[in-house]
Amino acid sequence: MSQTVGATRLAYSRVWHHISAVTPHPTLSTIKAPSEAITPPSLGRLASRIATILMGKHKPIWDPSTDCGDYVVVTNCAGLYTTGHKKWRKTYYRHNTRPGSLQAITMDALMEKHGGAEVLRKAVSGMLPKNRLRDKRLARLKAFEGDAHPYKENLVRFGGKVVGAPGWEEAVKAIREADMERL
């Protein structure tokens, strides 16, 4: 039995998670009415889940003073889902501390100028703790406008299939059945 307590290499290894911003998620999505289909996760729910993964709060070894979070690859940010009129009424402000330099931009203008990835990055940044680890955690967020991204080989795989990809549930069932037969 290992007597090592604290920062073991295996415990702090980083995993790559994939999240699609337009695919309905069983826990992050909401149902508007019983007759309607499940909506994609809203911007806030998606950002809070991403912030949790970036901080490492989903791990049993989580500690606020250590950086044990994982990488997150978010695709299809161009189709971010927002509720209500936020897309046209939400305003982002910036100021460079000089008189008269306050600038404002709405969410739809920001999405046209920089894309949905920047909107998601700002939302996640607001949900991370404001400390020295914030920039390091945000650097592990990789957001893309479409499906294509260069991190396909790094994503978490279970039974040879990328977790969350079509058909990965069947791979999990096959592995579980094989384990039950073996036991």
Curated annotation (Swiss-Prot):
Spell out the molecular function terms from Gene Ontology. Answer: mRNA binding; structural constituent of ribosome
Q: What is its main location?
A: mitochondrion
Keywords in alphabetical order: Mitochondrion, Ribonucleoprotein, Ribosomal protein
Pfam families, sorted:
Ribosomal_L13
Alphabetical list of Gene3D superfamilies matching this protein: Ribosomal protein L13
Query: Key word Ribosomal protein present in the record?
Result: yes
| CDD domains membership | Ribosomal_L13 (cd00392)
Family that this chain belongs to: Belongs to the universal ribosomal protein uL13 family.
Query: How is the subunit organization of this protein annotated in UniProt?
Result: Component of the mitochondrial large ribosomal subunit (mt-LSU). Mature N.crassa 74S mitochondrial ribosomes consist of a small (37S) and a large (54S) subunit. The 37S small subunit contains a 16S ribosomal RNA (16S mt-rRNA) and 32 different proteins. The 54S large subunit contains a 23S rRNA (23S mt-rRNA) and 42 different proteins.
Do you know which PANTHER family this protein is assigned to? LARGE RIBOSOMAL SUBUNIT PROTEIN UL13M, RIBOSOMAL PROTEIN L13
Q: Which NCBIfam families match?
A: rplM_bact
The name of this protein is Large ribosomal subunit protein uL13m
